[in-house]
From Swiss-Prot:
SUPFAM superfamilies: Nucleotide-diphospho-sugar transferases. This is UTP--glucose-1-phosphate uridylyltransferase. Belongs to the UDPGP type 2 family. The lineage of its organism: Bacteria, Pseudomonadati, Pseudomonadota, Gammaproteobacteria, Enterobacterales. NCBIfam families: galF (TIGR01105), PRK10122.1 (NF007516). It comes from Klebsiella pneumoniae. The keyword rRNA-binding does not apply. Gene3D superfamilies: Spore Coat Polysaccharide Biosynthesis Protein SpsA, Chain A (3.90.550.10). Pathway: Carbohydrate metabolism; nucleotide-sugar metabolism; Capsule biogenesis; capsule polysaccharide biosynthesis. It catalyses: alpha-D-glucose 1-phosphate + UTP + H(+) = UDP-alpha-D-glucose + diphosphate.
């Protein structure tokens, strides 16, 4: 399947429990990292990888996410009137020309796997991409036009095999999706076949692996049947991880070692790391911000 025909699914129906109380009234995907909400970084990455159709799986509490990608005629008219052309261009670039963003609702919180199934009427029985909205890949450490999601799509087009992005995570893996591969992976961008994939394992120390999934998946159409058959797993939810694990028993599924850095912005530490990193790079305020950080650390 040609890259341009792949749709990307972003599940944004989660309640953001790890970021309370900030997420009590604000969707976690709308929390800002400097001057853009988290979800904007995700969409920018997807578009950079060549995808033109994006499906947001939302919840009734996530109207702000939908509104962010809608056109605000009043705001644009005001910026035009006040000759704020740079700001106007930035607002209009939120949803780039030629990119379509669609919304479907997940009525019940039945897990990530169920959230993906909610997108099936829009995606159809086709291959597709899944990108989790709270894990930001640092575009300053790996060009999104070439690496990670873009490379996964290229490999999928070449091999037809589903792809899962992985990173090394020494320490406790009990809160993550743990990957075990047939061969060790050392170099960034390296690929190996998945032999085991477990969501939040009870005893991660029994697994001979320090690899975790990084919220980027390119999935063949065969995953739909596995999702339909998947019973509730960890936390009583239908897990995408379980469906991919079953698929990997029947056909080759690849793990690709992530290039660059990532931040789990669904948790406070990752969010703070991302904010500081992007703040120091900000073209307008970055230099002053770096100086203020130096003073704090002195």
């Amino acid at each position: 399947m040609n890259m341009a025909n792949l749709k990307a699914v972003i599940p944004v129906a989660g309640l953001g429990m790890h970021m309370l109380p900030a997420t009590k009234a604000i969707p976690k995907e709308m929390l800002p990292i400097v001057d853009k909400p988290m979800i904007q970084y995700i969409v920018d990455e997807i578009v950079a990888a060549g995808i033109k159709e994006i499906v947001l799986v939302t919840h009734s509490s996530k109207n702000a996410v939908e509104n962010h990608f809608d056109t605000s005629y009043e705001l644009e008219a005001l910026l035009e009137q006040r000759v704020k052309r740079q700001l106007l261009a930035e607002v209009q670039a939120i949803c780039p020309p030629g990119v379509t963003i669609m919304n479907v609702r997940q009525a019940q919180p039945l897990g990530l796997g169920h959230s993906i199934l909610c997108a099936r009427p829009v995606v159809g029985d086709n291959p597709f991409v899944v990108v989790l909205p709270d894990i930001i890949l640092d575009g300053g450490t790996a060009d999104p036009l070439r690496y990670n999601l873009a490379a996964m799509i290229a490999r999928f087009n070449e091999t037809g095999r589903s792809q899962v992005l992985a990173k090394r995570m020494p320490g406790d893996l009990s809160e993550y999706s743990v990957i075990q591969t047939k061969e060790p992976m050392v170099a960034e961008g390296q690929v190996a076949r998945i032999v085991e994939f477990i969501e939040k394992p009870d005893e991660p120390q029994t697994l001979d692996s320090d690899l975790m999934a990084v919220g980027r998946y390119v999935l063949s159409a065969d995953i739909w049947a596995e999702l339909e058959r998947t019973e509730p797993g960890a936390w009583g939810r239908i897990q995408l991880t379980d469906a991919i694990a079953e698929l990997a028993k029947k056909q080759s599924v690849d793990a690709m070692l992530m290039t660059g850095e990532s931040y789990d912005c669904g948790k406070k530490m990752g969010y703070m790391q991302a904010f500081v990193t992007y703040g120091m790079r900000n073209l307008k305020e970055g230099a002053k911000f770096r100086e203020s950080i130096k003073k704090l650390l002195a």
